[in-house]
């Protein structure tokens, strides 16, 4: 689950981190009033969506005219913002963040992730602020400095000082940076973050450290113990199909291909997508129906897959371990009849009672294409998607 920038900065403020005075506004009039409340003669207005690249897409504006703030809000509220991180439809703008303007002398980067390799929270800092960290990692990896947080001892001030020295901070900035580092590290574990970015973390013209942006991703598996964070969820930013899938405990991720994939098991699902790619196809989705591939869940999975108009064929790849393949086959048949599937469906069954499951499919009277192996299934579904 992701948070909006204004929500991230509200959390920063709770932990004593330096952020700009700002207000999230629902109407153009609120935006104008927010600028008046903030004071000053320059403001920054930002569309609030769960995507980067807002500035290049026109979703960020610096202005000293309150009527320009009104015009900006009137233009964007209720519309979708399309950036390089969204699909062609973009994401809806329901709030505009109005902030005081900050004079910038230098831009830095500070972020943290849960690193699977070290099984630790890892902080990353760089002098290359305002640039995508992936670009820095690819082109100049030596400019990324890391601090690994030991879960037993927690974050330590010396780790912040070590990063600060590498960033070239002066003694005053070092103290400020240490406070930011310690606050973020505490916040990361307190609220079960999966990702945290301040890009840019700036040094103002007055020489102070300031959090100019904020990006937070929450571990969805921990939301049951984070009621405050859970209430911050903005469902308008979710993909409609992914949100529908979550209601039925289906793991679905929309992609841009034309071969729908329905698989039980995340590893098998990824392998299925790989082999579809290998044989010239493009998966339209990742969909893991989990261990309990019941008729109801399979039916919902078909509905979700077929709600994508780009899907030209569906590959169902099921390994019967705990559940029997003949039961799964009956579920597939019932789901196909209920949903009224009109595109070719290729089914590969393996595991417990696989032969009986294939027999059930063959005797169903439905136009279901049986596959003997995963390779055979991939070849057949790619051909079906191409109309061959």
Swiss-Prot record:
Which pathway is this protein engaged in?
Carbohydrate metabolism; tricarboxylic acid cycle; succinate from succinyl-CoA (ligase route): step 1/1
Instruction: List positions binding substrate.
Output: 264, 321-323
**Per the record, what are the reactions this protein catalyses?**
succinate + ATP + CoA = succinyl-CoA + ADP + phosphate; GTP + succinate + CoA = succinyl-CoA + GDP + phosphate
Chain segments annotated as transmembrane: none
**What GO molecular functions are on record for this protein?**
ATP binding; magnesium ion binding; succinate-CoA ligase (ADP-forming) activity; succinate-CoA ligase (GDP-forming) activity
Cofactor note as given? Binds 1 Mg(2+) ion per subunit.
Give any Gene Ontology cellular component: cytosol
UniProt-annotated binding residues for ATP? 46, 53-55, 99, 102, 107
Q: What does this protein do?
A: Succinyl-CoA synthetase functions in the citric acid cycle (TCA), coupling the hydrolysis of succinyl-CoA to the synthesis of either ATP or GTP and thus represents the only step of substrate-level phosphorylation in the TCA. The beta subunit provides nucleotide specificity of the enzyme and binds the substrate succinate, while the binding sites for coenzyme A and phosphate are found in the alpha subunit.
Instruction: Name the family.
Output: Belongs to the succinate/malate CoA ligase beta subunit family.
Protein name from the UniProt record:
Succinate--CoA ligase [ADP-forming] subunit beta
């Amino acid at each position: 689950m992701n948070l909006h920038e204004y929500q991230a900065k509200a959390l920063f403020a709770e932990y004593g981190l330096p952020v700009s005075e700002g207000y999230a506004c629902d109407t153009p009039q609120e935006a104008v009033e927010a600028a008046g409340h903030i004071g000053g003669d320059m403001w920054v207005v930002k569309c609030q969506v769960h995507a980067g690249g807002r500035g290049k897409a026109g979703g960020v504006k610096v202005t000293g005219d309150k009527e320009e703030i009104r015009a900006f809000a009137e233009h964007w509220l209720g519309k979708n913002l399309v950036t390089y991180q969204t699909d062609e439809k973009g994401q809806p703008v329901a709030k505009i963040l109005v902030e005081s303007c900050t004079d910038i002398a230098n831009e830095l980067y500070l972020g943290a992730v849960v690193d699977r390799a070290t099984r630790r929270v890892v902080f990353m800092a760089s002098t290359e602020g305002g640039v995508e960290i992936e670009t820095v990692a690819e082109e100049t990896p030596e400019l990324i400095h890391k601090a690994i947080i030991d879960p037993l001892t927690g974050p330590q001030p010396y780790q912040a000082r070590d990063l600060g020295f590498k960033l070239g901070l002066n003694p005053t900035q070092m103290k400020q940076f240490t406070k930011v580092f310690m606050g973020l590290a505490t916040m990361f574990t307190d609220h079960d973050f999966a990702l945290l970015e301040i890009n840019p973390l700036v040094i103002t013209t007055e020489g102070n450290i300031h959090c100019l942006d904020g990006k937070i991703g929450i571990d969805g598996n921990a939301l049951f113990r984070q009621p405050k964070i859970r209430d911050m969820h903005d469902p308008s930013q979710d993909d409609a199909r992914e949100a529908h899938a979550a209601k039925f405990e289906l793991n679905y991720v929309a992609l841009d291909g034309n071969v729908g994939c329905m698989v039980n098991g995340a590893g098998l699902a990824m392998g299925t997508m790989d082999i579809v790619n290998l044989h010239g196809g493009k998966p339209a989705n990742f969909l893991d129906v989990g261990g309990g591939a019941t008729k109801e869940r399979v039916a919902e999975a078909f509905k979700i897959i077929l709600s994508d108009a780009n899907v030209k064929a569906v590959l169902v790849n099921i390994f019967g371990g705990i559940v029997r393949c003949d039961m799964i086959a009956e579920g597939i048949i019932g789901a196909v009849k209920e949903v009224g599937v009109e595109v070719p469906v290729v089914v590969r069954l393996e595991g417990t009672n696989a032969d009986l499951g294939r027999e059930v499919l063959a005797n169903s009277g439905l136009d279901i294409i049986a596959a003997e192996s995963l390779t055979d299934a991939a070849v057949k579904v790619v051909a079906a998607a191409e109309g061959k």
